[in-house]
A protein has these predicted regions:
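ATP/nucleoside-binding phosphotransfer catalytic cores, i.e., glycine-rich phosphate-binding loops
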Residues: 195-197, 202, 221-222, 227-228, ...
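A residue-level signal for conserved active-site and pocket-lining positions in enzyme catalytic cores
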Residues: 8, 66, 128, 156, ...
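Catalytic core of DAGKc-family lipid kinases
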Residues: 78-206
Length: 307
């Protein structure tokens, strides 16, 4: 088995690069020999993954955060199928949020991610697909393993991206601080949406999300009923809600007990389309590539994931 490890040294505000020698040694002990490739800029992981698979690599391990894993995933998938049907994808989480692995009951440190690879089995999981409006106003496609969302979460991404505190706060505290800061300035927004092949409906919402995994935003248990291989996305729409009431309910989102809140609309779906006359920001696996209009779909069991 030919293995390539693709590392984002900038993940976790540069922490991954600093501890890479330790991760490298641990990987050698657990998975044997491998070739290492390091990214230098955004988008590199997509291209490196695609080139590796086209060259016959059968196992790729992503080392970095949720955004890096998403890039590797987007190198894995082409035209809604795996580029190489036999290849497997593993991961070592060492970024800011590290949310995806929580859905697989792997705790937050990189050592547990590495240890999990030693005796990992291949599990076929679903992959989400978003056809969205990019920042240059063109239509683009992006796949996601965890959660795609819009509204407040996208604004939180922007807040974190431009804050110096990202160099000092840990993942969970950073996302919590950014959420509280952003909710005071980010309004409820009007969207028009369609679930599966149902009728067009209107709603004012502060946050909408389509979940394959269960956690996002640095350990928020946003979609407690989501399953990675059920062929469905968990749709949550946070209806029009005041800032005070949102902050009152925020602890419930971390606990996963928020589905009972009257302002939360929940349904399992296969497809969801949303548009707005306002600028509604997207968040896809922790990155913000564009805006609504967007269509979210599920691709059942197309990814060979090592878990």
């Amino acid at each position: 088995m030919k293995t390539i490890v693709i590392v984002n040294p900038q993940a976790g505000n540069g922490r991954t690069g600093k501890i890479w020698p330790d991760i490298e040694n641990a990987l050698k002990q657990n998975i044997g020999s491998f070739q290492t490739l390091q990214t230098k800029s955004q988008g590199d992981a997509v291209l490196l993954t695609r080139k590796a698979l086209e060259g016959g690599t059968t196992r790729i391990v992503a080392v970095g955060g949720d955004g890096h894993l998403n890039e590797v995933l987007n190198g894995f998938i082409e035209n809604d199928v795996q580029l190489s049907p036999q290849a497997t994808l593993g991961f070592v989480m060492s970024g800011t949020g590290c949310d995806f692995q929580r859905s697989l009951n792997i705790s937050g440190n990189w050592q547990n991610s590495v240890a999990n690879l030693k005796d990992a089995k291949v599990r076929k999981i679903d992959v989400g697909k978003v056809t969205y409006t990019a920042r240059d106003n063109t239509q683009k496609i992006r796949y996601f393993d965890n959660i795609a969302s819009f509204g407040l979460s996208g604004a939180v991404d922007h807040c974190i991206e431009h804050s110096r505190l990202r160099n000092y706060l840990g993942g969970s505290f950073l996302f919590l601080w950014a959420t509280i800061k952003t909710v005071f300035t980010h309004p409820n927004q009007g969207i028009s949406y369609r679930i599966d092949d149902g009728p067009q409906e209107e709603i004012r919402t502060r946050l909408g999300l389509l979940a394959n995994g269960r956690y996002f935003g640095g350990a928020m248990h946003a979609a407690p009923q989501a399953e990675l291989d059920d062929g469905l996305l968990d749709l949550l729409l946070l209806k029009e809600i005041s800032v005070a009431k949102f902050l009152w309910h925020l602890p419930k989102i971390y606990k996963g007990t928020h589905l009972k809140i009257p302002e939360v609309y929940f349904q399992k779906v296969r497809k969801f389309t949303a548009l707005s006359s306002e600028q509604v920001i997207l968040d896809i696996d922790g990155e913000s590539p564009g805006y609504l209009e967007a269509t979210f779909e599920i691709l059942p069991r197309i990814l060979n994931l090592e878990v």
